[in-house]
Amino acid sequence: MKAQLRALIGQGIEALRANGTLPADTLPPDFVVERPKTREHGDFATNAAMLLAKAARSNPRALAQALLAALPASDDVARVEIAGPGFINFHLTPAAYQREVIHVIKQGHDYGRGLAGNGRSVGVEYVSANPTGPLHVGHGRAAAIGDSLARVLDANGWNVKREFYYNDAGVQIENLALSVQARAQGLTPDSAGWPENGYRGDYIADVAKAYLAGDTVDLEGHLVTGTKDPADLESIRRFAVAYLRNEQNHDLAAFRVDFDIYFLESSLYKDGKVDEAVQKLIASGHTYEEGGALWLKSTDFGDDKDRVMRKSDGTYTYFVPDVAYHLTKWQRGYERAITELGADHHGSLTRVRAGLQAMELGIPQGWPEYVLHQMVTVMRGGEEVKLSKRAGSYVTLRDLIEETSADAVRWFLIARKPDSQLTFDIDLARAQSNDNPVFYVQYAHARVCSVLRQAQEKGLKYDQTHGMAELARLDDEHSLALMLELSRYAEVVELAGQTLEPYQIAQYLRELAHAFHTWYHNSKVLVDDAAERDAKLTLAVATQQVLANGLELLGVSAPEKM
């Protein structure tokens, strides 16, 4: 609908150029067509006249009047009026919204999908948890946001690759191996001789038990078997990493999160990518040596201080493999790279970008893009839940899914802006009431399915083609309000892709569900008149389709019964 109005406005601008109101060489401005904050100001508004006023040497309201007069007639527009300093407000006809219902029915699963990405490549990295323990609720928020963002970008026409980066080469992996070894040797976290920075959760005992039993882990087709030798630290390291990666994959599968690429930090060293990145930086002239260390002149690229790349002992600082990793993304042809991280990692953003810019490879400023999420507080019975016995120090994603459901966890972890603190209320997530937003939205979908079953049980034939032809019968307040909400869906999907904010889909679905429940309570659907009944069922089915499409973008199921 917005595209149709933009086309009308464009034709009006051409008419003003043709009649001399605008100079012939006036370029069409980048005007907006948007929904006003209040319905009293119409269904859509544009600022086109305000942007063109200078070129026309006219005040904006006078030019708005001229543009209004030059607009072609449209069956979708009931009236047009000027407001404020020169906004043009459009009031649409009921037929415009009724036709949108037909678009939903005909396009089905594809309704709301766009072409903004035009098949261009984007890599979306998310979760990227260290393989040192179970996924916690923070990883869950990263998974929910990142996976939904990938779905939204796909719906906007981007060629999306989903990527998980494993930090499998750092000190934490050494601490993991030592912890499992200690358990395998019969020690407990309270024993003398327990590693100073060891992991204390019960899961360490599970890993040690599996290792000593000679279990085999199938990690994406690669088999890793415990050698049963508690003295073989390298074998313990390999087995523990494989075991915990497999556990994380199990949790992610239960959470409906998939990846196309699993990238290992260790491969950067094995394949020489870290050395390659360092040599490119040295060759660019943006490094220097001081105190036996190699430094990057990162202050030349917006950092608050220069950064050590290679310490005097010859080892690299942690941000160097991060730069090398993102260099591989550029080399793999990603036009855009988006990384979803916890807000506690914000300090690394400037350093990684500085390292990439310093290579002088033509990498755009602001590449990669980042989406940062804040912490999650878990509540039960009005009190904060802080610990999991299995993990030892945090609430795991598996705990939340088992206590509520994958649907509820995904919804609640997505439904607020990523940069806002989030409270996950277990009691609310389990509630089967309208106060629970995921229940409220899913129930709207299930309610349509129930109505269709009732029609079938009563022997009432539903003719969808007839229903689409009879939509003009539905011109009451609640029907039109529901149609208006349906017409917003494609705009919300596009906006969520532009802003990298899938939470907007969740907000929209609540509003759509509210419009549907209001319509349902004020409109008997299975009436005796076949034409009216078919029209109402068609509106209900269109709502069902949009709810299903939107829930799919969030990775939440659309149940037929509740």
Swiss-Prot record:
- Spell out the PROSITE patterns in the cross-references: AA_TRNA_LIGASE_I
Alphabetically ordered keywords of this record:
Aminoacyl-tRNA synthetase, ATP-binding, Cytoplasm, Ligase, Nucleotide-binding, Protein biosynthesis
* Matches recorded under Pfam families: Arg_tRNA_synt_N, DALR_1, tRNA-synt_1d
| Biological process (GO), any one | arginyl-tRNA aminoacylation
* Xref: InterPro entries: aa-tRNA-synth_I_CS, Arg-tRNA-ligase, Arg-tRNA-synth_N, Arg-tRNA-synth_N_sf, ArgRS_core, DALR_anticod-bd, Rossmann-like_a/b/a_fold, tRNAsynth_Ia_anticodon-bd
Q: Where is this motif: 'HIGH' region?
A: 129-139
GO molecular function annotation: arginine-tRNA ligase activity; ATP binding
Subcellular location(s): the record lists:
Cytoplasm
Output the superkingdom of the source species: Bacteria
Please list the reactions this protein catalyses.
tRNA(Arg) + L-arginine + ATP = L-arginyl-tRNA(Arg) + AMP + diphosphate
What EC number(s) are associated with this protein in UniProt? 6.1.1.19
Q: Which SUPFAM superfamilies match?
A: Anticodon-binding domain of a subclass of class I aminoacyl-tRNA synthetases, Arginyl-tRNA synthetase (ArgRS), N-terminal 'additional' domain, Nucleotidylyl transferase
Provide the leader sequence positions: none
Annotated Gene Ontology cellular component terms: cytoplasm
Q: Which residues form a coiled coil?
A: none
Member of which family? Belongs to the class-I aminoacyl-tRNA synthetase family.
Cite the record's note on assembly.
Answer: Monomer.
Q: By what name is this protein known?
A: Arginine--tRNA ligase
| Record organism | Xanthomonas campestris pv. campestris (strain ATCC 33913 / DSM 3586 / NCPPB 528 / LMG 568 / P 25)
